[in-house]
Curated annotation (Swiss-Prot):
It is an enzyme of class 3 (hydrolase). Transmembrane segments: none annotated. It is found in: Cytoplasm. The keyword Aminoacyl-tRNA synthetase does not apply. It catalyses: a ribonucleoside 5'-triphosphate + H2O = a ribonucleoside 5'-phosphate + diphosphate + H(+); a 2'-deoxyribonucleoside 5'-triphosphate + H2O = a 2'-deoxyribonucleoside 5'-phosphate + diphosphate + H(+). This is Nucleoside triphosphate pyrophosphatase. It comes from the Bacteria. Its EC number is 3.6.1.9. HAMAP family: Maf (MF_00528). Nucleoside triphosphate pyrophosphatase. May have a dual role in cell division arrest and in preventing the incorporation of modified nucleotides into cellular nucleic acids. Keywords: Cytoplasm, Hydrolase, Nucleotide metabolism. It comes from Synechococcus sp. (strain WH7803). Belongs to the Maf family. Gene3D superfamilies: 3.90.950.10.
Length: 191
């Protein structure tokens, strides 16, 4: 069984849809205390901190691995996590509309024992995202839905945000919160 070290409902849904047996335990890691100038390294550090925090509290022998994940959007040299409020979300969207950004998700898998066929590893997967050229009214309507305030980069591809993304280059599930193809490579077939 996999233990997901994340509070993200989207990550949990991805695992459920992929029929990967799992449980969830929120790490409680202070994400604001972890810094790095390069987004791929930042998300790996955050994912590793979450996985290690949960792994350190583990007592259930049925858990074979702990997975920590974290995502940020890199846009024109800036790193966007979740917007602080609606005004910040609107300002970001006015900058992002019609442009590409890079959604980085760090994944850290920690095996819980040496007897499992799982090896511990960390990796960042990056997906390029082309945002639709939205009008100010469309941005205001999307932000007023509340959805952009809950997600890294200010959009949820699996929700209303699916209509405001023109194109992806890379892994679809990565934009939602974790790369299922990467997880398939990491986990044994009989997991």
């Amino acid at each position: 069984m996999l233990l997901l070290a994340s509070a993200s409902p989207a990550r949990r849904r991805l695992l459920e849809q992929a029929c990967i047996p799992h449980r969830v335990q929120v790490s409680g890691v202070d994400e604001d205390g972890i810094h790095h100038s390069e987004p791929p390294q930042l998300v790996c550090l955050l994912a590793e901190a979450k996985a290690k925090a949960v792994h350190g509290q583990l007592t259930d022998p049925s858990i074979h691995a702990v997975l920590g994940c974290d995502s940020v959007l890199a846009f024109e040299g800036e790193v966007f996590g979740k917007p602080a409020d609606a005004e910040e979300a609107k300002a970001r969207w006015r900058r992002m509309r019609g442009h590409w950004g890079d959604l980085h998700t760090g994944h850290c898998l920690i095996a819980t024992s040496s007897t499992t066929a799982i090896s511990s590893q960390c990796q960042c997967i990056t997906t390029r995202v082309l945002f639709a050229d939205l009008s100010d009214a469309e941005i205001d309507a999307y932000v007023s839905s509340g959805e952009p305030l809950q997600c890294a980069g200010g959009f949820a591809l699996e929700g209303r945000g699916g209509c405001v993304v023109e194109r992806l280059n890379g892994c679809y599930s990565n934009v939602i919160g974790l790369s299922l193809p990467l997880l398939r490579q990491w986990l044994p077939q009989d997991f």
